[in-house]
A protein has these predicted regions:
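Core of compact, soluble alpha-helical bundle domains
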Residues: 1-139
Length: 139
């Protein structure tokens, strides 16, 4: 049995964020949103999202931003589809399951699901997603 660390430190959360978004950049359904549509600067995005998840999960201050407003602006250009929300959550959960385990890992997975469901309802141009998370293969 191999030991997987929990997502209990900013360093581990940063590693999760980088690992996840490398996968996003290679995903046929998500890459067009992040790479083509949003033109994400990955190093800035990794830093911002590391601060976001450290704030959400560990209570560490430092995140400043308005994610719903930014995502809503993107969705006005090309509306987000429900399968994109499902893929984002499935890939996020799969990334966590492949490298981390423990109460913080499970908590972040639950919070990611809630955030994605909320975004799908709060962004006017997005398709509302039913919250069903597809099975992904752990790699």
């Amino acid at each position: 049995m191999s030991y997987l660390p929990d997502l209990s430190t900013p360093e581990e959360i940063g590693r999760l964020v980088r690992t996840f978004y490398v996968r996003v950049a290679e995903d046929d359904l998500l890459a067009p949103v992040f790479v083509d549509q949003a033109g994400v600067d990955w190093s800035t995005h990794w830093e911002t999202l590391t601060k976001f998840w450290c704030n959400v999960e560990l209570g560490i201050p430092g995140f400043v931003g308005a994610p719903t407003r930014k995502h809503a602006a993107l969705s006005e250009e090309v509306p987000f589809r429900s399968e994109q929300f499902a893929r984002w959550v499935g890939l996020f959960h799969d990334t966590i399951d492949s490298g981390w385990s423990g109460p913080h890992a499970e908590s972040i997975k639950a919070k990611a699901l809630i955030i994605a469901q909320s975004q799908s309802r709060m962004i006017p141009t997005a398709e509302t997603w039913d919250g069903e998370v597809p099975a992904m293969s752990v790699s």
